[in-house]
Amino acid sequence: MNDSTFTLGIVGARGHTGAELIKLVAAHPRLQLAFVSSRERAGQRLADHHPEFQGELRYENLDADAVAAKGVDAVILALPNGLAAPFVAALEAAKPDTVIVDLSADYRFDNAWYYGLPELTRGRYNGQKHISNPGCYATAMQLAIYPLLDLLAGPPQCFGVSGYSGAGTTPSDKNNVELLADNLMPYALTNHVHEREVSVQMGVAVEFMPHVAPHFRGITLTANLWLNRVQTREQIVERFQQAYAGEPLIEVVDEAPWVSRIAGRHGAQVGGFTLAPGGKRVVVVATLDNLLKGAASQAMQNLNLALGIDELTSIPH
């Protein structure tokens, strides 16, 4: 068995997702963390922020050329939307076979990139070095819709609620705990980037209404699905069980899942499966941790896949 190690760098390591990535890398037997880039923490020891990581590695403030000059096997870009392109260009120029996993939305609509939602798109992976990690809401939406895709009679309506960690670390109303107290904040109620993302990936128009809640982490996604023919609940449940059979990170549950039960866990739960009278409308609920299956854990699945390592290495399941 080949047990060679691979070198990895993380750009955007200060954020919530970067922190989860560092934990996963620290537990990975075949990844060596070569650098972590964070403008705000430059010079600080990684171990002082992440006790699970041993060693003297320090945060650096690296621009695109400096990242490319490191010559690592793989780079994870955990940056806000719109910032990935210079890093991608520099890495392509310096070492074209570098595996790049981008967590932003920047390349989710680029057919030259593999769209990495492994449970749904694993069959499309064909050695691509550039991987676009799906959005957190987008992952939950697709898991709720996919098993019924051929039965849809119209656009799925998806009501999403996320913990405020999804708003990142840059201060805003959507991560202000005082403003969020006893509150629910609707935002981007049409044309959210994840609405567009899922519409492209599923090949069907999706209507998505996101909200931010006072809890820190975890997404609840409630999908209202109109069907083109009558179904029983048993038929619906069987479709989901068949779709996710053999997928350790996707759990099909009978009752509607609670976000409090998925926070801190690396997979997703899908359940509820409530049919309206007449059998042509069903409501499905999906929950996942937006920082894990919605970001870091999924990125690790994709990185493992690209490096030829067992997909779930370092991911508790």
UniProtKB/Swiss-Prot annotation:
Pathway: Amino-acid biosynthesis; L-arginine biosynthesis; N(2)-acetyl-L-ornithine from L-glutamate: step 3/4. The keyword NADP applies. The active site is at C136. GO terms for molecular function: N-acetyl-gamma-glutamyl-phosphate reductase activity; NAD binding; NADP+ binding. PROSITE patterns: ARGC (PS01224). GO terms for cellular component: cytoplasm. Signal peptide: none annotated. The keyword Oxidoreductase applies. It is an enzyme of class 1 (oxidoreductase). It catalyses: N-acetyl-L-glutamate 5-semialdehyde + phosphate + NADP(+) = N-acetyl-L-glutamyl 5-phosphate + NADPH + H(+). It is found in: Cytoplasm. It holds the Pfam family Semialdhyde_dh. Belongs to the NAGSA dehydrogenase family. Type 1 subfamily. This is N-acetyl-gamma-glutamyl-phosphate reductase. It comes from Stenotrophomonas maltophilia (strain R551-3). The gene is argC.
